[in-house]
Amino acid sequence: MIHIITGTLLGLLFLATGARAQFQFFEQMFGGGQQQQESQEHNVPSDSSWYQRTYDNARCSDYLCPGTLACVSVPHHCPCQHPGVEDKFELGDGSAICVSKGGFKPGEAARKVELARKGLL
């Protein structure tokens, strides 16, 4: 009789411990408690009014790049928004594009841009 009660109590103890571990896992995984409040301060809703105010208040006598708010002499001189992961290519028609480096070997992204411009890619 004692073995049955002991076995039952041990079983309940293991179930309770397992359930607590699962809840802790989900709380950790989905940012429960204090961490969630901290992350909410950083994840604010998108608000274009900040960008519009910054754009309107920028001082530039030539061309103000819309993506980076850099002041350049002509539009195709605008820098890429993420130069660490993008390469810029000036096209012959006075425009420019930024292309993800994407792990290509040096010069490979430029070659692919040229092939695409010729309709070969």
Curated annotation (Swiss-Prot):
It comes from Blastomyces gilchristii (strain SLH14081). This is Long chronological lifespan protein 2. It comes from the Eukaryota. The keyword Transferase does not apply. Belongs to the LCL2 family. Probable component of the endoplasmic reticulum-associated degradation (ERAD) pathway. Keywords: Signal. Transmembrane segments: none annotated. Residues 1-21 form the signal peptide. One of its GO terms (biological process) is ERAD pathway. The keyword Cell membrane does not apply.
